[in-house]
Amino acid sequence: MSKATLQRRPLVKKILDGADDNLLVIAGLGSPNWDITEAGDRPLNMPLWGGMGAPVGMGLGLAMAQPTKRVLVITGDGDMLMSMGALATVAAQGPDNLAICVLDNEKFGETGNQATHTSPRNNGPTDSGAGTDLSVIAKGCGIADSAMVRDQAEVAQLVKDLRMKKGPVFRVVKVMVEKLDFVMPPQDGAHLKDRFRQALLGSA
């Protein structure tokens, strides 16, 4: 079982504290959606309700289309495992305004907390994963600035890196398994797209 001590909601709140119009946020489905909404719903948040595996590719495209903006992708380990190939494309394109934060609780939280491949190998029936280290995979894909964060002492630097450091930046943050209330963003996908577009580009 993970020995993580970081709580995801306070962490995401710190990451997004003081977010302005320069910060564009893409959140993977499920818990990252609830996390960014708990921190404060805003038009320049784009929560992906059902797009498992999509946030990194979407974040890359947005970073390339909006090079003067900071693009932050916040997603989970299950989602990132589904779209690892996107990391090689991020490395190939090398956008300096893109940061990716994977909140890794070693579980598929939306389907019953089954172990993901990032959980330890042969550690009992609820944690029988492969010990996959997504930060090592990102580095192997060519993202040089890739690291794992485990401790509260590392959080202040994590926030600075995600918000300001030249990208692409990739961080895996080990977080606790918690049972948290859902804090729902708007559920209409067309509305989310339209308000994001208007906030970013203005009225057509």
Range-by-range predicted roles:
Residues 1-2, 17:
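Helix-loop-helix hairpins and the membrane-proximal interhelical loops
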